[in-house]
Each structure stands twice: as C-alpha cells, then as structure tokens.
Swiss-Prot record:
Keyword Transmembrane: yes
NCBIfam families hit by this protein: CECR5, HAD-SF-IIA
Gene: crd1
InterPro entries, alphabetized: CDP-alcohol_PTase-I, CDP-OH_P_trans, CDP-OH_PTrfase_TM_dom, CDP_ALCOHOL_P_TRANSF_CS, HAD-like_sf, HAD-SF_hydro_IIA, HAD-SF_hydro_IIA_CECR5, HAD_sf
Similarity comment: In the N-terminal section; belongs to the HAD-like hydrolase superfamily. In the C-terminal section; belongs to the CDP-alcohol phosphatidyltransferase class-I family.
Organism field: Schizosaccharomyces pombe (strain 972 / ATCC 24843)
Localization terms from the record: Mitochondrion
Family annotation (PROSITE patterns): CDP_ALCOHOL_P_TRANSF
Entries under Pfam families matching the protein: CDP-OH_P_transf, Hydrolase_6, Hydrolase_like
UniProt EC number: 3.-.-.-, 2.7.8.41
Record's protein name: Cardiolipin synthase (CMP-forming) / mitochondrial hydrolase fusion protein
Cofactor: Mg(2+)
GO molecular function annotation: cardiolipin synthase (CMP-forming); cardiolipin synthase activity; hydrolase activity
Amino acid sequence: MLHTINYRSWHLAARQLGRSTFRKFTTESSTKSPIADVCFAFDSIDGVLIRGGRGLKEGTKTLKFLQKNNIPFILLTNGGGMHESVRAQRLSKTLSVSLTEDDFCQSHTPFRALADKYKHVLVLGGKDNSVRETAEKYGFKSVINELDVIAKLGTPFWPFTSFNEEDIKDAKDFDVTRPIEAVFTYVDPVRLGLDLQLVMELGQSKNGVLGTVSKTANEGPDIYFSNADLIWPNEYPLPRLGQGAFAICCESVFKELTGKDLRNTKYGKPHKLTYDYAKNILMKKHKTLGITNPPKEIFMVGDNPESDIRGANNYGWTSILVRTGIFQGDNSPKYSAKHVSDNVWEGVRWALSKHVPAAKLNKSMGEVRGFHTSSRVLNTVTKSNNSKPIQRPLRENIFTLPNLLTFSRLLSAPLIAYLYIYDYTKAAACFFLYAGFTDLVDGYIARKFDLGSIAGTVLDPLADKTLMTCLTICLAVRETMPLTLASLIIGRDVLLVSAVSYLRYKSLPAPKTFRRFFDFAIPTTELKPTRISKWNTALQLLLLGLLITEPILPFDASFAKSPLFYIVGCTTIASGASYCISRNTFRNIGKSKLQ
C-alpha cells in the first residue's frame, strides 16, 4: 500500500526550486514569446539524446532549438546515484548544450520534496559516498548509510560480507538509539544482502530504532524506492536485475517474516508521483516566461514503451516514441505511442506542427529533412516486468551507401589480382581506378550525409589492406616490386589485422560464435587510423597504381619508382609503430551502461 504524499511537500519543493535562478531559455531576449505554448519531457539516458555514451546530433540540435525559442523542457530519467548538478555537467559536455540541475528529474529527484518531513534518514545504494552527499544537498539534515551501520554495529549485524578499514573509511558515527524516520533507496544496491537486512530490521522495528522489534510490525520508518525497474540492459547479452528486484525481495521477505505487506512508496517512471514532480518543475519554468495559464500540451519523448510511453499515456501527456534506442518498429502493441518517429528532432517537429502553422515551422526548423537510419541503435533488451525479455544483440544498420562502396572495393581486390597475373593489364588498371575512386568518396559521403557506422570503421581499412595485400603479392611474384618492400607491407598488415581480430573476439558479447564474429552489424571494436597511417595508405596506393598501370602509360615511369620504394618503406614502418604508441587507436565501443 502506497503512502499518501503530503502535497504541502510539493509546495515546499517549488519554493526550494524558486531559490535557484532558472537559466534563460534563449540566448536572445528573455521576454521573447515561445514559438508554441507547449512543454517537453525527454528521457535523457541512452536512446533519445545520447547513444552509447555519445551525444546524438539530433539531440543537441533539439535542445538548442528549444532553448532558443523559450520552450520549457525537462530531462526525465530513471537513472540516478548522483546529484542533478553532476548529471547536468556530464550531459552538457556530452551534448555541447548548456544544462543546469533544474533541467533534470532523476528517479530520486522527488525525494528533495521530503527533506523537511524527516529529520534522520537512512539512504541505500551506490558504491561510494555520493548518495549521502546527494541527500544532504537535497536538504536532509541527518543522513546515514549502510556502511555507517556496519561500522557502528560491527560484523555480527551482517556476518556474510567482510568489510575492511578501506571500506568504512568514510563511515559516519551516529546515535544508534535515535529513531530512523525514513529509508530511501536512491540507486541499485551494491550490497544487496546488507541492505535487505537493514530494511527488514527497520520494517519490523519499533519507531525506526535499530535493534528493536514492534509487536504489530507496522511501526517502522517510511520506506521509499526511487526506481521500480525489474531489469535493465547493459553490455552483457542478458538483462541485469535492477532496483525493482530489490524492492520485490524486500516485499517478499517481509511478507514471509510477518505475514503483512511492507508499506512502501515507489517513484520513477512510469509511476504517477514522478510525473507529478516533473510537471511541477515544468509549470515553474512555464511561469518564468510570464504565462499564467497551463501549457496547451505536454509531450513525452522516449525510447522505452514500458516506462516512457506507458507513464506518459497514463498521466495524460502526449507520447512520442523514437527509434534511436531500445524500440524498433512501427509502434508498441502493448503501450502504443501517439506518434513514432526516427529520432527526437523529427518527434519534436511533429509535436510543434500541431500548434504552429507550417510556414512558420518551416522557417524556424527548416524544411522536413530526416536523418538516415544508420543513426539508430537496437539495444540488447526489450524490458517487460510481466513477460520474458526479448533478447537481441546490439546491432546497427550496415547497408549504407558508403559501406556498399567499401564492400565493392573489398571484392574487387582478388579480381584485380587475377586480371593482372593473367596480363589483362587494361582491365586490371580500370578496376584499380574504380577501387581508388570508392576509397575517396565513401568517407566523404559518410560524413556529408551522416551515414557513418562502426562497421564502416572496420570495413574501410580491411578493404584497403586486402587490396594492397593482393596486389603486393602479385607485384612481388612478377618481380615488379622488391621482395623486401612487399614483406614490409604484408607483414605490417598481417599484424594489424591480427590485433583487430583479437580485440574483436575479446570484446564480442557472448555467445562468441564464428557466425557472430564475422557479423559486422554487431559493433565491438573501433579502429581509428593514425595520421601517418593515412599518409602511408595514400602513398602505397600511389605506388601500386603506378606499377599496375605502368604497362599502359604513354611515358616511362621508371624515374619515379625507386624514390617511391624507399618512401613507402619508411612510412610503412612508421605507421606500424604509430598504432603501437598512439592512444585510443583501438576503442571498445560495446560498453554503454544505462544508468
């Protein structure tokens, strides 16, 4: 049974928010009227504004547009474990957008409305002291955590985990006879057994005093959970248990011990209390624009039907589902959104089109222009608390024009070698020129039209190395190229391909099968060519092109071959060494934990 929240707390929260200065929503005049009388809420973790720890250009563009046009928004997430000011700093850097703590509503942000209600509280979750520090910044006067308890009461309180001096170095002394008035779980517990023991003891205590037992088992402190998500996805191929699992453990064990239900309150999406708090912040921002009436419509943009869309629909907000995260498809059959778009920019454009004339909207946002589907990511898990998770590997769209050009260059390598060996020199030269052309344009197209992909960062150098290896062997066999130089070129490429293959195998999510290893739609390791390596590739292609096309050239090219042999030999050695000494040449892109 949920506690009834004292709505005076919301008033106190509004007063507290009022003490801080809200950022102006525009870099122009602060009195400029918004383009539409609406508000937005965005899921701020992977899938809407960022992906795999990197900012999406659609996300940056959207937030800057809303700020410029004085349209209030809030970043509403089930993540937590840190203060909103820390989260704002991190996301500001990731998105290159100026954000403040007032732009965020994390799963535990509504706890700040309860700071005046409780004098002495216990906080749970997280690895370090950040949860306690967050609670103190919210205004809680006396805050203890589980390590304070174990330091005070010793090993007998929880004998199944050993704690050393390093673990409890930040422990805070407290009066064990002082009643604990509330227990707050801010983020997924790291010490689940200890935290479960604490909740059980306090739930059965008399007035929240440790070491006491209530005869009625209903005199304990108020208990709060900030996030009821049962599971969540990370880089591991199967979902991990979340804070919701801890809440279920607490409820089940308490029921078994006492025969009664554990009284507790749950926050986070899709629960109404979190949306109440988020709406309170949006209304405060709305009033700073001098608009006293409520906004005509509030839109929620998310990638998770289970939490984002379900919560928005239940609360009466207009839901927009995007395909840049967990969800991929036409719409969710279980929790259908009012609108589905490829990305957040297109979703916001649709929302504003309901309130802004087309001509005015086109002037503000430009003509309708979609982003390529390669910006989409399929995540590892579709979450549902009521059904088994649908397991999918993290994948991306690899069938883009740059990748197809690169793949054609890869296939042309053995064909060029065959034609050259059997003296079809003109045909070999033509195909070589085609391969060189694709090498020039594929990268340009990827950058110009936002068609880049992780698979492309692997396929492009692989195609170059395959082409050069095939031709180098042919030229060495026909004694057109010195054997020493051919050995240098091939040896460097063999070592480089071996290193990439090894790192891909190590970072490939389970199961590590032969088929999945060669499935480049599953991104794992990104190879970033060094500058000297790019120069070396260009010089090698120049040398190979000269040697391949020499039989059909209208002039004698012998004068250029010897200098190129020496130059290419030196750059080959230097580029090989650069991969060994350069930082961030190989990057594991598979790890993108959702908080």
